[in-house]
Design a protein with these regions (language model features):
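Long helical/loop segments within the catalytic core of UDP-sugar-dependent glycosyltransferases
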Residues: 1-10, 23-24, 28-103, 145, ...
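Short aromatic-hydrophobic micro-motifs that form the base-stacking/packing surface
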Residues: 11-15
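The conserved acidic donor/metal-binding loop of glycosyltransferases
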Residues: 16-20, 100, 114
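Nucleotide-sugar-dependent glycosyltransferase catalytic core
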Residues: 133-149, 275-277
Length: 300
């Protein structure tokens, strides 16, 4: 229908209905389109991080992933992935490849589909969209279960395709996509490893070769890093004071991924959609939002 309109558009922007959008979002996306980028994900911020400890810890996770994963990969020339909202896709991409995604995480699937053709998903760090985070643990688990199901499904289908395309084209960016789509499996393997490590500490049944490669103290430092990195990000974006209390509860949220991820694996072939209810009706001027002034500073 859009293709038949008299006015033609260079790209599509996709948002969730509950989102708040930074006034300079379109300007930033246009800058990225001018650079020749075709599939772009904006910065996924939170509009209600202080509503509850669940919303707060959920927001911390998104902030950390934005800075430590998406931005980092973009800066070194690797592909990231679409996040379901705050997305910009060039019209020519839709015309050539369509959408045709069937998993519960169709945003991730679309990124992986394009990556097999050598098309990267890039990151617009200053194109900010404020998404509503769920406020209860039950709603959070339900939403994350849907994500886990979709990500496992997507991994099963696209790891072989990415490997074949990456080897055939000799493209490290495509091969790196395997790491992107394999994250739920990494968490699953980490869970199994931790369980056996605890058992082995009391009833030695095997030799841990990881401790032979590097001292246990080094692995402990790596483990501490998962809580140190969010701290660095929170200091950088100047979060509301209440978030610092939620930061103390962040480990609870992190480990709550374990049962969700395990259940997601068992249900990875179930494609029944579960709706996430959003009720937080606020405007840009109604709440204190992080990074509202960042882009103005960057433009000076």
């Amino acid at each position: 229908r859009v293709d038949k309109m008299d006015r033609k558009y260079d790209a599509f922007l996709i948002f969730d209905a509950d989102n708040l959008v930074h006034p300079q979002f379109m300007l930033e996306m246009n800058d990225h389109l001018e650079k020749g980028e075709s599939v772009i994900q904006g910065y996924l911020n939170s509009k209600n991080p202080t509503d509850s400890w669940v919303a707060g810890t959920f927001s911390i996770m998104f902030w950390m992933v934005n800075h430590m994963w998406h931005l980092a990969k973009y800066r070194i020339g690797l592909s990231t992935a679409l996040g379901g909202t705050g997305m910009c896709i060039r019209t020519s991409i839709i015309k050539e490849y369509g959408w045709d995604c069937t998993s519960l995480t169709e945003d991730m699937e679309f990124s992986m589909k394009l990556l097999t053709h050598g098309i990267k998903t890039t990151w617009a760090h200053d194109a900010i969209v404020y998404d509503e985070k769920v406020t209860t643990m039950m709603a959070s688990c339900k939403q994350r279960l849907r994500w886990a199901q979709g990500q496992f499904d997507c991994a099963d289908r696209y790891i072989p395709k990415l490997f074949a395309a990456g080897i055939k084209q000799g493209n490290i960016v495509i091969l790196d996509g395997i790491l992107q789509v394999s994250q739920p499996y990494f968490l699953l393997l980490t869970t199994v490893y931790l369980v056996f490590s605890y058992i082995n500490a009391y009833v030695p049944i095997y030799t841990n070769i990881l401790y032979q490669i590097m001292p246990m103290s080094v692995w402990q430092i790596i483990g501490i890093g998962q809580y140190l990195f969010p701290l660095i990000v929170l200091l950088k974006i100047k979060v509301p004071p209440k978030i610092w209390f939620y930061y103390l509860l962040y480990p609870i949220f992190v480990y709550s991924w374990v049962p969700v991820n395990i259940l997601g694996w068992f249900r990875r072939h179930n494609k029944e959609w579960s709706h996430t209810v959003h009720t937080r009706a606020v405007g840009l001027g109604d709440v204190k939002l992080t990074r509202m002034g960042d882009m103005n500073k960057n433009k000076k």
